[in-house]
Swiss-Prot record:
Domain of life where this protein originates: Eukaryota
Gene3D superfamilies given in the database record: 3.40.50.880
One Pfam family in the UniProt entry: DJ-1_PfpI
Keyword set includes Lyase: yes
Location relative to the cell: Cytoplasm, P-body
Full protein name: Glutathione-independent glyoxalase HSP31
Gene from which the chain derives: HSP31
Modified residues (Cysteine sulfinic acid (-SO2H)): 138
Amino acid sequence: MAPKKVLLALTSYNDVFYSDGAKTGVFVVEALHPFNTFRKEGFEVDFVSETGKFGWDEHSLAKDFLNGQDETDFKNKDSDFNKTLAKIKTPKEVNADDYQIFFASAGHGTLFDYPKAKDLQDIASEIYANGGVVAAVCHGPAIFDGLTDKKTGRPLIEGKSITGFTDVGETILGVDSILKAKNLATVEDVAKKYGAKYLAPVGPWDDYSITDGRLVTGVNPASAHSTAVRSIDALKN
């Protein structure tokens, strides 16, 4: 029996975003933690982005977010994580039938490109239609902005419960005004737009993830591992 496979999506957006001039992009642990979780459970993992390129969110490289074994894995060019990243694919190089889980990692960069990432959305929709799981963490649910259920033609999240980075969190980070200026939808905006029920954690930094059938979402970097675990459980069930 062929090993189960996960398609782990990254944002292609990597440009100045924060008020201090730092770039946003992929939030490291939101890709690293799911990757390591899936690999530990025996899954093969491929990385994909809409353009086949990616860059790191510079704030996610700070010691507060990247330390210990995570930092070791990230800096080791021979780590399983980095070797797999080096083979990142474009959607055109991917066959949705090969994968059982689509996992959208995050970083504020996703708010820029996921809603327009039609090829990534098509693959996610196909994996879901095939009976697979679609998961997203933190700002990853931006992928649901325009993502349809192939079987119904309706928005994938319509009538479902999701979570994701909170509007309160955006305010605490001081980026709410930046999002408004750039006309970027928050995860809560996306939920409202498509008729999903948004469930918030008690605190914006809590480890909090939820499952609604084969749809799995998590709220922040601390939830990346639990979101991956829930994805595996949803596939088993």
